[in-house]
Amino acid sequence: MKKILVSVLSSCLLGSALSAVSFKEDSLKVSFEGYKTKDMIGTKGEFKNVEYKFSKNIKDLASYLKGAKATIKPSNAFMGEGNDIITNNITKVFFPALLGDTDIKVVFQDVIAGENKGVISAKITMDKKSTIVPLTYTIKDNKFEAKGQLDLHTFKNGSKALKALSDVAAGHGGISWPLVDISFNADLAE
């Protein structure tokens, strides 16, 4: 009887350990790609030093992600090595015109989890206006990637910010597109 009880307990512990989910904190990354010119050429960037808060419930991915929050400081946008002018245009012209001096807030409200894929309803708040952006996610080789598209025209200063960016960035050819691809990436903790 004792062996059966130990075997059952071991199986339960192993099963719960296998389904426990969390992210490696040093792997978390929020990226974006905006588009410019009449040919819709992409320009990629990321946000550094994002503040994250995840659920302490790690029994499964949906529980871990539901209610997760991120606070993004627009001044921490980084457009890549050697792209100081682009980074400056984004942090000193575009985001101040879009947001003033407020942060971007993200909350994962709902999560539908399938087998290594799913959908997250992300509530994104900028300058006191919120919109829900569906993010589709996949997990492959212990890497999590969620992607969606944000329409900047949703926000009251979206058109103004896009025009300000087009005016200061000659490489835009007078066009900054309102659609921005957004992504959240992380490595799963072992």
Predicted segments, located by residue:
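Short helix-onset patch at the extreme N-terminus, typifying the N->h transition
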Residues: 6-9, 25-27
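Bacterial N-terminal signal peptides
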Residues: 8-16
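Positively charged n-region of N-terminal signal peptides that target proteins for export
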Residues: 1-4
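Low-complexity, acidic/polar, glycine-enriched regions of mature
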Residues: 20-190
